[in-house]
UniProtKB/Swiss-Prot annotation:
Active site residues per record: S9 (o-(5'-phospho-dna)-serine intermediate)
Domain (Resolvase/invertase-type recombinase catalytic) ranges: 1-143
This protein's name: Putative transposon Tn552 DNA-invertase bin3
Role summary: Potential DNA invertase.
């Protein structure tokens, strides 16, 4: 059986392209993950897919970084599939799916390619994080870094959350207890404390 696995790192990303790609390569069953886990253990759908595959199956992913967040995780997943005698197919790397000729050389080359790709993938991820941190630092120095938009604020996208924000400010100004406010408007005490701090309310 041909099993596909697709993952996007956030709910905002489009999953359709990956799904179409996997179907093009004959995936009969596709597992999809719409969350970003910091480790394989935090990717329940990947775990489910790996548990599902059986000896003789083919496991398809679009790129090697779908198999793990770093070099060790990728190699661990690859070895897990090997132990189960499941063929791994990476659609973005056609040569991985071609037989070189000599079985021993074939195995050696593919193992080597996977190790190199896993290492490069981890380096690219680290470099991306470094550039992001550098960009944030520059933005902070220029006074233009805004950070993530606040869920409850006077400028919140959701009008209902703007109403809640103003209600919290009103209750704080009335001197009501943090726990009472949090319970009444159904938000966390940490959020109430943050709104209190942002408004300079003692």
């Amino acid at each position: 059986m041909i099993i596909g696995y697709a993952r996007v790192s956030s709910l905002d990303q489009n999953l359709e392209r990956q799904l179409e790609n996997l179907k093009t390569f004959g995936a009969e069953k596709i597992f999809t993950e719409k969350q970003s886990g910091k480790s394989i253990e935090n990717r329940p759908i990947l775990q489910k897919a790996l548990n599902f595959v059986r000896m003789g199956d083919r496991f398809i992913v679009e790129s090697i970084d779908r198999l793990g967040r770093n070099y060790n995780e990728v190699i661990h997943t690859v070895n897990y599939l090997k132990d189960k005698e499941v063929q791994l197919m990476i659609t973005s790397l056609p040569m991985m799916n071609e037989v070189i000729g000599n079985p021993l050389l074939d195995k050696f080359m593919k193992d080597l390619i996977i190790q190199i790709l896993a290492m490069v993938s981890e380096q690219e991820r680290n470099e991306s994080k470094r550039r992001q941190a550098q960009g944030i630092q520059v933005a902070k120095e220029k006074g233009v870094y805004k950070g993530r938009p606040l869920l409850y604020s006077p400028n919140a996208k959701d009008p209902q959350k703007r109403v809640i924000y103003h209600r919290v400010v009103e209750m704080l100004e009335e001197g009501q207890a943090i726990s009472k406010i949090a319970k009444e408007v159904n938000i966390t005490r940490q959020t109430v404390y943050r709104i209190k701090h942002d408004n300079g309310l003692s």
